[in-house]
């Protein structure tokens, strides 16, 4: 039985369709209900509508609202402030880790990543 069988909702936010699709396949196979966004603004819209249990957010997304700013917006919004957020980045780790956590992210994960390590991180954050 997949670990996410309770159909917890996860929103994947990344401008790279390949990353979104890899995460989609990996997490759906674990039983999670997946939503996707390619921009910060779209992520905010989906999060307000769907109320995901977890958001996996790329730190560098286009559309005028980068991942850290989007995280800050979501954490300051009464409708979405309880969503858990894992920041995903291929950039300088320590600097971005601090910025992410300061913005309200619950955890941080580096690219490239192994799907199994990401599943473990998701389970850890969701508790």
Which stretches of residues belong to each language-model region?
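C-terminal output helix
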Residues: 113-122
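Charged docking surfaces used in two-component/phosphorelay signaling
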Residues: 21-29
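Alpha4 helix (beta4-alpha4-beta5 surface) of REC/receiver domains from two-component response regulators
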Residues: 65-69, 92-109, 120
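Active-site residues of response regulator receiver
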Residues: 58-59, 89
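A short, hydrophobic beta-strand element within the central beta-sheet of small alpha/beta folds
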Residues: 82-92
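His-Asp phosphorelay/catalytic-motif detector in bacterial-type signaling
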Residues: 51-53, 79-84
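Helix N-cap/capping motif at the beta->alpha junctions
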Residues: 36-45, 66-67
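Short amphipathic alpha-helix used as the core "switch/output" element in two-component signaling
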Residues: 45, 68-81
């Amino acid at each position: 039985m997949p670990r996410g069988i309770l159909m917890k909702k996860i929103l994947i936010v990344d401008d790279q369709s390949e990353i979104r699709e890899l995460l989609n396949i990996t997490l759906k196979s674990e039983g999670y209900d997946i939503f996707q966004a390619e921009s910060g603004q779209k992520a905010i819209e989906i999060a307000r509508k769907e109320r995901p249990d977890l958001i996996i957010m790329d730190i560098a997304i286009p559309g005028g609202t980068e991942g850290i700013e989007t995280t800050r917006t979501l954490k300051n919004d009464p409708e979405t402030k309880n969503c858990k957020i894992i920041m995903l980045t291929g950039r300088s780790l320590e600097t971005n880790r601090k910025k992410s956590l300061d913005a309200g992210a619950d955890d941080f994960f580096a690219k490239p990543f192994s799907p199994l390590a990401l599943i473990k991180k998701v389970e850890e954050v969701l508790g």
